[in-house]
């Protein structure tokens, strides 16, 4: 009807993905819908979303420190994922024997409903409310090489002097020089439900002035179980096989490639169970006005909340995992959850935020602006297993990370050209935990830089570009003071993107460039990645008024671009575990638009 409208959209997908996993690793879909009812003075909109999607999670994988691929494993197109390794058996968060499916990859399951209502009231008041309730669960299951090295040394680290490896599928002796120690990053997301409401009331005045009063409230559950296992695998990209370990006297130290239930190579650090709830309440106020050619806005917010729940770490026991009536060597020490000795989570937090900005319009084509702001975030599950005291409390300085930022910029428009330039300075706190290195972070960063954005239109051509220069350093580090003054890992001095597009009567064609200069792999500032530029091309054509076909080629020149690595220095064998951009990928899209 004239006052009721709706929108329904979504996607369904199925495929292997950009790297060769050996199975259908991207599978699932989403549907989103909304229904809007218009009134004379506002509207009410209802939302619904259902998501159940699986996509492979690519973690750092083996390559040489200069980005070259290792024989048999292409760093740009291969992955340790394999059709010969799809299941893992472990104890779940309740210490019951259960199985995980590596093919689940990143598998969020979300059902979300919500509404928003916006109405204009008498005397220039406006009332708004937005509400959302989400039921969230799922899985994360991927493979991370914990070690890439000599096959014989890895075998002997498990089975002793003279231990050998064999193919877990065929039983044939394994004679390659290199092998991988694989850990399954296996997480069951039991309950990530959330409830969010944002209410605001705005008063507008005749002189371009308005003031808003609001109240935000949310509840977020974080209940999940980390269920790691350890395997050996050949270093190969196309359906790599699992490897078994046999001692010199014939004793079997593994079964179907699994040599440990847990991660003894990491000290069995990471078998974990979380069951926590985080509540947040935040009143806020915002003000804006215009004084001649100067626009001013200011806002303030006070966040407070509480964290309640418990968490438990690892404990080992003897368990007949395959129920065959015998206890194998891996079954002698099975990592489970220490439920009997769970630790409490019981702390509160609060912090204030503000932002003040001004824009001065010098003339219709030139303006300057400035902003000073302070914000923060309450730390949640990353504090557990490190910063939470025995009674569940947390130090005030650990509960919240704050950010202070200053910006100043200029905006200039010409007939066909626009240029925006912003200088910034930021101070950022970080409390964090990295599972793959079992490292806690308690530090502060300082960064200053300049960001430039520009657009240029001439005839049928469209050019766009942006670049950011950043000078960042680790200003403080409570746990590792040796890195103070160093550049934060993965932070390049310059990042940029450029795009050129030609628009013709029935479509468009163009090319884009995304690039970065050199960056350090880790905070010790030793191993450094080369900068790179990724070139992408695209072309589209309207087959009819409603039907369009498009061709996209990403990484047109098959460039190697390393984005992160576990190692901070080049190891003796020159092999690192790193993540690189995908090699060349091509897609063809057919789109039909309904009238």
PLM regions: where:
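Residues on the lipid-exposed face of transmembrane beta-strands in outer-membrane beta-barrel proteins
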Residues: 1, 33-37, 115-119, 197-203, ...
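Predominantly transmembrane beta-strands of Gram-negative outer membrane beta-barrel pores used
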Residues: 1-23, 30-38, 45-47, 116-119, ...
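Repeated loop/turn-to-beta-strand initiation elements of outer-membrane beta-barrel proteins
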Residues: 3-6, 41-46, 125-127, 208-211, ...
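Transmembrane beta-barrel strands of outer-membrane/channel proteins
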Residues: 8-14, 46-52, 129-133, 213-219, ...
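Acidic/polar loop-and-plug regions of large Gram-negative outer-membrane beta-barrel proteins
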Residues: 25, 36-38, 43-116, 139-190, ...
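Structural signature of Gram-negative outer-membrane beta-barrels, strongest in the C-terminal barrel
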Residues: 192, 204, 208-220, 225-229, ...
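Gram-negative outer-membrane beta-barrel transporters
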Residues: 293, 416-434, 440-524, 544-546, ...
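Outer-membrane beta-barrel "beta-signal"
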Residues: 409, 574-595
């Amino acid at each position: 009807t004239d006052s009721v409208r709706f929108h329904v959209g979504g996607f369904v997908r199925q495929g292997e993905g950009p790297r060769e996993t050996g199975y259908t690793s991207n599978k699932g879909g989403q549907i989103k819908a909304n229904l809007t009812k218009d009134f004379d003075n506002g509207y009410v909109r209802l939302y619904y979303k259902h998501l159940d999607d699986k996509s492979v999670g690519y973690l750092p994988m083996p390559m040489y420190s200069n980005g070259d691929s290792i024989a048999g494993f292409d760093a740009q197109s291969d992955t340790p994922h394999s059709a010969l390794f799809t299941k893992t058996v472990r104890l779940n968060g309740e210490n019951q024997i259960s199985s995980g499916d590596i093919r689940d990859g990143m598998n969020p399951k979300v059902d979300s409903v919500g509404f928003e209502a916006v109405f204009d009231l008498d005397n220039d008041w406006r009332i708004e409310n937005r509400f959302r309730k989400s039921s969230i669960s799922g899985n994360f299951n991927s493979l991370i090489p914990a070690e890439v090295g000599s096959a014989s040394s890895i075998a002997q680290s498990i089975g002793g002097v003279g231990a050998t490896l064999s193919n877990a599928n065929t039983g044939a002796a394994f004679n390659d020089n290199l092998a991988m120690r694989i850990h399954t990053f296996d997480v069951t997301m039991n309950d990530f439900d959330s409830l969010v409401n944002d209410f605001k009331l705005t008063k507008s005045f005749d002189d371009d002035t308005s003031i808003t009063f609001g109240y935000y409230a949310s509840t977020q559950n974080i209940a999940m179980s980390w269920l790691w296992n350890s395997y050996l695998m050949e270093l190969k990209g196309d359906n790599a096989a699992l490897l078994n370990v046999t001692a010199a006297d014939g004793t079997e130290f593994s079964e179907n490639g699994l040599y440990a239930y847990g991660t003894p190579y990491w000290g069995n650090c990471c078998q974990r169970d979380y069951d926590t709830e985080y509540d947040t309440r935040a009143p806020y106020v915002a003000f804006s006005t215009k004084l001649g050619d100067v626009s001013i806005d200011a806002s303030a917010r006070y966040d407070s909340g509480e964290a309640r729940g418990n968490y438990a770490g690892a404990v080992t026991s003897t368990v007949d995992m395959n129920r065959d009536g015998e206890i194998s060597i891996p079954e002698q020490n099975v990592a489970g959850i220490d439920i009997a000795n769970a630790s409490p989570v019981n702390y509160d937090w609060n912090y204030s935020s503000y932002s003040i900005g001004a824009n001065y319009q010098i003339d219709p084509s030139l303006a300057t602006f400035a902003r000073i702001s302070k914000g923060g975030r309450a730390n949640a599950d990353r504090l557990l297993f490190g910063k939470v005291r025995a009674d569940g409390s947390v130090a005030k300085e650990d509960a919240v990370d704050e950010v202070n930022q200053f910006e100043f910029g200029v905006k200039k428009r010409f007939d066909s050209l626009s240029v925006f330039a912003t200088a910034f300075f930021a101070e950022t706190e970080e409390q964090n935990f990295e599972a793959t290195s079992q490292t806690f972070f308690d530090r502060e960063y300082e960064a200053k830089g300049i960001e430039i954005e520009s657009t240029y239109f001439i005839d049928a051509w469209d050019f766009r570009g942006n670049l950011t220069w950043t000078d960042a350093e680790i200003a403080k580090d409570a746990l590792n003071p040796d890195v103070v003054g160093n550049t934060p890992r993965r932070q390049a001095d310059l990042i940029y993107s450029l795009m050129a597009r030609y628009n013709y009567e029935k479509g468009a064609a163009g090319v884009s460039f995304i690039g970065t200069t050199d960056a350090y792999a880790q905070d010790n500032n030793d191993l450094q990645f080369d900068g790179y530029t990724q070139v992408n091309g695209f072309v589209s054509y309207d087959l009819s008024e409603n039907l369009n076909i498009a061709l996209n080629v990403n990484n047109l020149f098959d460039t190697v671009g390393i984005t992160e690595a576990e190692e901070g220095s080049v190891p003796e064998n020159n092999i690192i575990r790193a993540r690189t951009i995908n090699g060349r990928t091509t897609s063809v899209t057919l789109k039909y638009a309904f009238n």
